[in-house]
């Protein structure tokens, strides 16, 4: 039986009020990495931590998840807020 990995696009709310969008196969592990300062360069800055994972979307393929991440990163702040409201 094949054990398929799930792929996630996620959004963090940083301590400074900014959003960070990323990709992972393990959201809990990735959140721990971001909060410990070993995650993405963006979240390594102390002023951005701690971070809270405020959104996750599950995809079947890495390609779908990274496309969602790329699309989110192109949005303006206002558009990101609107996008997140559609899910919550």
Swiss-Prot record:
Residues 5-82 form the GIY-YIG domain. PROSITE patterns: GIY_YIG (PS50164). It holds the Pfam family GIY-YIG. PANTHER family: UPF0213 PROTEIN YHBQ. Belongs to the UPF0213 family. This is UPF0213 protein EF_2693. It comes from Enterococcus faecalis (strain ATCC 700802 / V583). The lineage of its organism: Bacteria, Bacillati, Bacillota, Bacilli, Lactobacillales.
